[in-house]
């Protein structure tokens, strides 16, 4: 068990890692949605996980906040953190993922490295999805 001083030191270390150490003494209601997500990531990092699970980490965030959260997640990936991410942010997935798994109605429809997934999808469902999201 950590002492109070050790816990505060560790908390500050992870708040710095997610780029919001200046928010340490604020209540959740005083933080933006993106800041709240980054606090959640910092809180999880305090447990020294081997893998982190993210379920739509950018849902309900505005574009600026989405960038803040995705930048933190890119940093985690670059540091070697294993992440399982459910996302509709295809640009982020293309950049960070080692492996893409596309699901439809609870079933795995396609599994491939990002380059193959985006450039040479096998299933008709994946092709349809990509044609709809990549046209804008």
PLM-predicted stretches and their roles:
Residues 93-95:
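A short, surface-exposed alpha-helical micro-motif characterized by mixed small hydrophobic
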Residues 41:
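Hydrophobic anchor residue at the start of the ABC signature
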Residues 67-79:
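Helical segment within the ABC ATPase nucleotide-binding domain
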Residues 26-29, 47, 79:
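Conserved signature/switch motifs of ABC ATPase nucleotide-binding domains
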Residues 87-88:
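H-loop/switch region of ABC-family ATPase nucleotide-binding domains
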Residues 52-55:
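Catalytic Walker B motif of ABC-type/P-loop ATPase nucleotide-binding domains
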């Amino acid at each position: 068990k950590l002492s109070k001083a050790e816990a505060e030191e560790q908390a500050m270390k992870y708040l710095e890692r997610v780029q919001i150490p200046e928010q340490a003494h604020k209540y959740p209601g005083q933080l933006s949605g993106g800041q709240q997500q980054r606090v959640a990531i910092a809180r999880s990092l305090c447990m020294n996980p081997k893998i982190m699970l993210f379920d739509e980490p950018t849902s309900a965030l505005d574009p600026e906040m989405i960038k803040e959260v995705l930048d933190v997640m890119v940093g985690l990936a670059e540091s070697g953190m294993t992440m399982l991410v459910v996302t509709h942010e295809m640009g982020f997935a293309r950049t960070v993922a080692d492996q893409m798994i596309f699901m439809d109605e609870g079933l795995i429809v396609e599994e491939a490295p990002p380059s193959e997934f985006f450039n040479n999808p096998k299933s008709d469902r994946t092709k349809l999805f990509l044609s709809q999201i990549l046209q804008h």
